[in-house]
Amino acid sequence: IQVGDRAWLPSEAAGSTDKEKVHYLPGIWDDVFITVTGKIRVDKALFLPSLAKKQVTVKTLIRSLYPPQMLYGDNMKDICKFEFRIKEKTTGRIVSEKTIKGEPKRDNRTYFETTIPIDNPKAWTPDSPFLYEGEVSVYNQDKLVDRYSVNFGMRDFSRRGKFFTLNGEKFYLRGSNITLQRFFEDQDCQALAWDREWVKKLMIDLPKSINWNAMRICVGVVPDFWYDLCDEYGIVLQNEWFYWQNHGWDEQIRKEYTNWVWSDGNHPSIVIWDAINENWDNYIGNTLIPELKKLDPTRIWDAGYMTSTQMGTNDEMDEPHPYRAITLMHSSKLNDYFKKHPYNLGALHDNWTGFSYILDAGVPQLVNEYGWIWLWRDGRPSKLTLNNFNYYLGENATPEQCRELQAYWLELETEWLRSERSISGILAFCHLTNNYGFTGDWFINDIKDLEPSPAFHWFKHCFAPTAVFIDLTDYRYTKHLQPLTPGSDLAFNLVGVNDLNKVSSGKVILKLLDEKGNAISMQEEPIVIESFGKRLQPCLLKLPSKAGCYL
């Protein structure tokens, strides 16, 4: 199926343009199934869980293929029986059943809703992604005419003040972004997006190895089996529609978004519907989202850059993008700029011009983009970040030097954000995108091998659920600070953070290294970090009397 160029679509067609894509790629890119049923069939079904209430609300749209009433006295409806069954996915053990009767209208779709209790439900979490199978059987004149099944999980995702909660407990999101629609433009994409083992390594194995529990599906959805993998192995998702720049009439947008919720709404991994990327749309934010919230009340909605200022009580969360280094792209006089606006890389207490809103907001703040320091897979700076690398490394930096700077920079920015405990989640940009584009991902060489760049090594540490960071500006990457005096005292804080629901304690070993990597002093600092908390641990180092470079 080929639609043609993006510009040929009619004005009412819902969807947007992505200004970081080059081509419009229409056509079928997910599985298509042909099913054989009777004349009354399940068109759509949602199994919406409530772990707290130990029940599942099942919403169905039943499609009748019988012809409409043609003559006076002809049937307008048919009496049917609907059997609902819930089973454990792995064992097949039936945990609950219910039967209702209804009358689907002929040549139409009819809505039915029922609630099914579950005794002792097993919760779905990233650490224990337990799945159930929901089944709907349709009987017409006591004859089975359709059977429809989906997987789902028993989990409650909500918010409490500025924080997300999973199954009633505070939950911090840690992870990255997937821009699959951009990756489709990559000359090395080929059939990788439909290779289950490749996708599992990308979406499950690598993220879990570096302490990620979340991913944002960014500027366009992915094939259904990607969501299945996240359901099965435990990665939570912010699922974003194809919306950056506006396109489409309101009624068509309603149709597309409503179908989206029905289509993807059974996946327990999807905990946030992301309606817009970096934009504002009053119809979506204040009319459509409240309407769709009634269809699916089990998830949170994000409306791009819209906040409580535009949405009032409809605002459930915000998505700030603290790209602190963006100025390096726009300023032609970087040295003068940084004299007035120094960027103290490594100083975790450092403020940022856009940080005040994050601190003052009353809803969860999910930083789902940051890290304006992209490279292509061959180690060259991307289109947007050439000036970054030229400023810090010079114009002749090697790929290895660029990768090491990128990795270290991302570590320190991650530490900076995680140190602000009112931020409810941190998703770096970007885990997968098209090569040779405006941005970049953190793989090197051939993408089919998913060979990690040095950034992954640092991510493992800065994304650890319990971690300790050094709150100290790195003098190697600043031009506005004078060297410290040999033999002086250096006072700073260690910052301990804990995303877990239990107290974490241990000892921190602090070493001072010379330029050859030799330890010239060492001290131990005991530290205790409360659950979901932060601990500042003051430290004092006596600097060497010999001038030189130290770490």
Task: Locate predicted features.
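Substrate-binding/catalytic cleft of secreted carbohydrate-active enzymes
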Residues: 199-202, 214-447
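Secreted/periplasmic carbohydrate-active enzymes, especially glycoside hydrolases
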Residues: 1-217, 237, 256-259, 271-272, ...
